[in-house]
Amino acid sequence: MKIIKRNGQEAIFDEVKITNAIIGANKEVVETERLSEEEIDNITNDIKYKCQKMKRALSVEEIQNLVEDELMKLNAFSVARKYITYRFQRALARQSNTTDDQILSLIECANEEVKQENSNKNPTVNSVQRDYMAGEVSKDLTRRILLPEDIVKAHDEGLIHFHDADYFSQHMHNCDLVNLEDMLQNGTVISETMIEKPKSFSTACNVATQIIAQVASSQYGGQSITLSHLAPFVDVSRQKFRKEVKEEFETIGLELDDEKINSLAEERLKKEITKGVQTIQYQVVTLMTTNGQAPFITVFMYLNEVPEGRLRDDLAMIIEETLKQRMKGVKNEKGVYITPAFPKLIYALQENNIEPNSQYYYLTELAARCSAKRLVPDYISEKVMKELKVDQNGNGQCYPSMGCRSFLTPYIDENGKPKYYGRFNQGVVTINLVDVACSSKRDMNKFWQIFDERLDLCYRALMCRHERLKGTPSDVAPILWQHGALARLKKGETIDKLLYGGYSTISLGYAGLYECVKYMTGKSHTDPNATPFAIEVMQHLNDACTKWKEKENIDFSLYGTPIESTTYKFAKCLQKRFGKIEDVTDKNYITNSYHIHVTEHINAFDKLTFESQFQKLSPGGAISYVEVPDMQDNIDAVLAVMKHIYNNIMYAELNTKSDYCMACGYDGEIQIEKDENGKLIWVCPNCGNKNQDMMSVARRTCGYIGTQFWNQGRTQEIKERVLHL
């Protein structure tokens, strides 16, 4: 059995330390009020038993709380007072420097919480450690100086989650849609170097990767680009190759007709497209940003984003090559092709690619094979999205998420035209719906009262995020604010005008709708008797966003939070506050956003149809998924799911497994098992390899693909997922 020390380091549970701490307090009281040795031993044994029953590693603070509880039960109030006083004195001493232990444990790779905090960061690498060290300082400043005490307390207790506190001390925003078109067509500046309009497709791809890296280093959230912004450069290369071919043959005294020139130019063009797409794939996975990780980049593939004709056909060629290269994968250090985490791919399903006889159906078939093997692309239904995202002109719009799942709301610019690329999200604060429910003790009136109190906390926390960005000069990130990624502001000009009027969004996140409904009604939100309550909860969240938007002229939007690592924190906080309630707080995770619980048996089609109604109520972002087995030999079934997505839900993905054991070469599913301490570990079923450095495991974490393993809560959630096909 293990515990988590205050610095995040994992240690063996040592009951002697509990006994010694009680003995120390016991000696400080008069003899008539002291506990006997037997009573002290009983307390220690009771605490050990309770820790074992929790089936997870408790923190030192949680164990100390148990000690206090046991002392109070025995009416040993004097001993309890001494124990609490000593604990308080030690806490004061620790507060004199709040970061040393955390940072030292990071450097020595001994911090278990950080090791599993981000499934796309390797905490043993120097560059990642530097980012985490800076993050510890930022969190310390945020907690002690920048945030009100009640918001910090609510965050610590798991009532809300104030996201990305490790970046809050700086004036940084969350995620965005990069205006690659403006930067490539009109030029940009990277590291004080003028970059003019590219003269070829491959150069455009190279410039795009440099932009991606610069943008990632200037923000903490994900970014998205669209391949349609690269498509015009295909014809730039085509015309260049036509000219080259013609000149080469004229040099040797030969004349070719246009048909032959075009044929030779197209051959060279295909190689150019392969080279350009390969540049993006390999640059993205090998670049290291100042965040200590590869850029969290999403690439959008949407045919109808460009006019019909040659430009759309050129875009189709880029999409085809992108899918082929992703299906192939990238080689790991052993030379084996594996599934890369990035870039995340999104493929738009539309009228001209969804039916077997449609013009671009061959791309949809290729996308299906790619999803079956490499977990991407994810899918946006143009049809459904245009029904949900209607702008002020009354036109439905289709555009990508910012990174994983955060969506902008429709916006019309000063020229009366829809605008999406160049917009961003200011940040996220998430409400723990499970805690709202459990705090109400099933009293419905009390539930709505507590709900509103927690929403007020979220509102004030979100305004802290907004105020942190307000007054930010464009100079803090020239690539974003001055050179076209998001705007073309002047030097010294603040970004304030971009924070209001719907240009950017700010997100109220929510988590644990399933557990909330389960506690209040005794039923899953899939039960027809419980679904109306779930919808009512969602509507209440949206109503709060509407009220705040009208008050502040800021685009508050409801967001289905992925809670990648926060799921474990919320679960631990809930168990600490309410104990283990069956099907509510008895897991080491809570359910993402509105999702059906991972253990609930339901087929893929019913799941997507049911969840679509909640996706409509998450305008700030949400994604649904279905868990599937190896589908590489059943592409027809994958295509059937994709067709269902097109007709029923805006944004969805298929989760499968893509693993490799470097110890024995096994490429099937790596299993999750418990070790002798009850900790969940990854094990190769073929050779028994347990060394995470000797295996490649790719799982959908929360929209992105994670490849650096997960905390115990998320690992349990992954282990318990049932198949939907």
Put a short name on every predicted segment.
Residues M1-A110, K719-H724:
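Charged, amphipathic alpha-helical regulatory modules used
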Residues Q89-G502, K523, D527-Q692, S696:
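Conserved catalytic cores of very large enzyme subunits
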Residues I273-V277, Q281, K518-Y519, R714-E720:
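Metallocofactor- and cofactor-centric catalytic cores in central/energy metabolism, strongly enriched
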Residues N686-L725:
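Long insertion/accessory domains within large nucleic-acid-processing enzymes
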